[in-house]
Amino acid sequence: AMVTTSKGTLIAAADQRNTHWSDWGNIDTVVRRSTDNGLTWEEPIDVIDLKSQSYFNGTQSAYTIDPALIAEGENGKNPGRVWMLVDMMPESTNGSQGTYSIKETGTGYVKVDGKDYLALYDKDNNQYTLRENGEVFDKENRKTDYVVKQFEGNDKQGYHEKGDLYQSGKYVGNIYLRSASKNNDSAPLHPKQTCYLWLSYSDDDGMTWSEPVDITP
């Protein structure tokens, strides 16, 4: 994807496949900027770089793929803002065959008191919901001691820790990782194994990007 901003900067967004050409695995969403109409390009900027398992061998990674860009004009609601829409997959092999292929249906969200919340599940398939400020509630609508990491301001590391789960302040894994081999970094709670739609934006011509927001429901 490529757009020209209201200031004349070219921004190109792409999948950075770090290990192989397939549509799964360790894939980051990156952008490059040009301020001279494409004659030269700056170094890639990581927008989203989700976690992989320590035993990654081609598939054991959460990832984002297929970014789309829209640039607002100076007379837009958010003058000069650049929006990015991207598909997000928890640890999986996309729609391909295999144990961790994307095969669950639905949005991955449930309604609580009229609001949509991301559903999380434990190993016994008990349902939880991810609420405001990263708080996690159980099926009986009781707040638990689980909290998902929140970010303040823009993160220059591609939101690598997005999805990190803490229990009583202790890190217990990442909700977007799921496989259970030795030394895994999977959290005890995880969302449905389906595709999600994330939205991010930049207000400085693509130099920094907001924390992606899941707009799936």
Q: What are the residue ranges of the model-derived segments?
A:
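Asp-box/BNR beta-propeller blade signature and adjacent active/binding-site loops
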Residues: 1-217
